[in-house]
Amino acid sequence: MYAIVEIAGKQFKVTKDLYIYTPKMDQEAGSSVSFDKILLLQNDQDIQVGDPTVAGAKIEGKVIEHVKGDKIIVFKRKRRKGYKTKQGHRQGYTKVLIQNILR
């Protein structure tokens, strides 16, 4: 059984007991979350496609931790002007364990 769910504008293919990294959420580590924007649900040869979402479907998960992604270097330079600047950026993510997919 798997589902395609939309979380914060991004789509994820999830199954039970799967860890996913979503854009940072406001929930604390250890709290439970539920997602109801299910776009597609597959269950034992039966596929339900939402219009735009599958009615009555829900995914339950648990927030494991908040992490930061790899560092990205932003470097700007203008030739012959002596202008250069260097910045770093690390995107915040939330690690979520998918516990259950409900119809």
Swiss-Prot record:
An annotated GO cellular component: ribosome
Disulfide bonds: none
Residues forming coiled coils: none
Keyword RNA-binding: yes
Gene name in the database record: rplU
Organism annotation: Amoebophilus asiaticus (strain 5a2)
A Pfam family the protein falls into: Ribosomal_L21p
UniProt keyword terms in alphabetical order: Ribonucleoprotein, Ribosomal protein, RNA-binding, rRNA-binding
Subunit-level organization: Part of the 50S ribosomal subunit. Contacts protein L20.
Protein name: Large ribosomal subunit protein bL21
Similarity annotation: Belongs to the bacterial ribosomal protein bL21 family.
Domain of life: Bacteria
